[in-house]
Amino acid sequence: MKLIRLLPILLVIGLSCLTSCQKEEIPSADNERTLFMYLPWSTNLTSYFYQNIEDMEDAISRRGLDKERVIVFLSTSSTEAELFEITVNNGICTRQILKEYTRPAFTTEEGLTGILNDMKSFASAKTYSLIVGCHGMGWLPVAQSKARAATKPRYHWEYSHTPLTRFFGGLTAEYQTEVTTLAKSLSNCGLKMEYILFDDCYMSSLEAAYDLRHVTRHLIACPTEIMVYGMPYSHIGE
């Protein structure tokens, strides 16, 4: 009889031990912030994007990551891209591939929404920030840039003895994304950025800011051209 009475007590104790063991095995992943570096295909900027990433890693290796994650979308060619995370351990940064893409439709609302959802699913956080690196067109729509292309303007790289910049307009329309497409894609994912930093030319127009007013709290951009090597990430990354 005494053994029978003890069985319920032993059962409760056993379940309590199992529950406590399960709780200890669950890692604490309290990610406060996710920074998303979005570097789509921009024809002649890829080598500079790699340098931008290395500069960001240089900053991360010095300061570390405190409840934050850094995710990068990089077009390695006009038809291929990869999503990876920058992690740091003992001052050494590594890149962990999260997903690879073939012909990503980053110029469409559906395609860009998918990329943003991938970032969100891999690195869910309380707050998000976005860095966009590519050529910039300001508020001009893609259709308008096609019309302008018919006039065969002379671009910055056609001039000799002048430093290259991230000139406005992009090189070809098939790789250009409307500002409104970015805004709709962020909204589709339920994202409101703490800030959007455009490492592109001419992106601080009132029209572009108005289109993005519901999807970011702050806009960091330039009203003029930006030099081709982009922002000094080894410094601002700290």
Where are the language model's segments positioned?
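Bacterial N-terminal signal peptides that target proteins for export
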Residues: 1-8
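C-terminal motif of bacterial Sec signal peptides marking the signal peptidase cleavage site
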Residues: 17-20
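Structural recognition of the beta-strand scaffold that forms the well-ordered cores
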Residues: 34-39, 69-74, 128-132, 194-198, ...
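Solvent-exposed loop/turn segments at secondary-structure junctions
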Residues: 41-44, 76-80, 104, 134-140, ...
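Short, solvent-exposed loop/turn and secondary-structure capping segments
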Residues: 48-49, 82-84, 140-146, 208-209, ...
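A short, glycine/acidic-enriched catalytic loop
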Residues: 137-188
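Active-site-proximal C-terminal subdomain of hydrolase catalytic domains
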Residues: 191-238
